[in-house]
Amino acid sequence: MSERHYPVEPRAPAVLTVDVGGSHVKAVLNGIDERRRFASGPKLTGKQMVDGVLELTTDWDYTQVSVGLPAPVVGGRVLHDPVNLGKGWTTLDYEQAFGKPTKVINDAAMQAFGSYEGGRMLFLGLGTGLGSTMILEGTIAPMELGHLPFRKATFEEYVGERGRARLGNKRWRKAVIETVERLTAGLLPDYVVIGGGNAERLDGELPPNCRLGHNEAAFLGGFRLWVDQA
């Protein structure tokens, strides 16, 4: 990486941040300007993810772990297996598996925390589906807004990757803008951050008080889980 998006401070904890996606598992250690990855896919189990990360980072010295998963997570508990991955994510003891203090969070929430600049922020992650999180004066509130009704289906069915493939980029962008406008009207955030792998496909003007995020924010979010109160 040419630019570091996660901080290094004297006495800062050495946090290994793991961002689990449908195609890759990515790992970053704060203080090292390097990102490592390996392929995931629909058969990847929770244990295989941990084993892969441990093998990938044998030469890294860290004291804590943050894991972002594409699944609902409440109070550190994974509610169901990720849709685009394998099984065994809900029953895995992540802290025991890594052998370090470990925090597990929804992947959109982790990226949201890394994008947060105070106040009331709505984060929308455009990728395979629609990730969503609000942060209210420092308190993280993961959401599943993608499942709410929109037009003739749900928000996710229009602005997720399958929606983009069906609509084409031009109509998909219009659906994204309308999604931002509707959710902003209902949730009243101070500002909106749009992240995820498809955020870069949004060219042109964005709605007021809306900006594009950076996928590296997930790693900053993983670090912040151990140094900030949220």
Please annotate each region the language model reported.
Residues 15-19, 62-66, 121-125, 193:
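Short glycine-aspartate micro-motif
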Residues 69, 126-128, 196-197:
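Short secondary-structure boundary segments
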Residues 27, 67, 194-196, 222:
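Residue-level signal for inorganic ion chemistry
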Residues 25, 89-92, 96-111, 120, ...:
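Glycine-rich phosphate-binding loop plus the immediately following alpha-helix
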Residues 37, 41-54, 58-66, 71-120, ...:
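Glycine-rich phosphate-binding loop and adjoining helix at the ATP-binding site
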Residues 2-51, 136-166:
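Short glycine-rich, Thr/Ser-proximal phosphate-binding strand/loop in the N-terminal lobe
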Residues 24, 183-215:
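Glycine-rich phosphate-binding loops at beta-strand->alpha-helix junctions
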Residues 25-29, 71, 113, 130-136:
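Short beta-strand scaffold segments in enzyme catalytic cores
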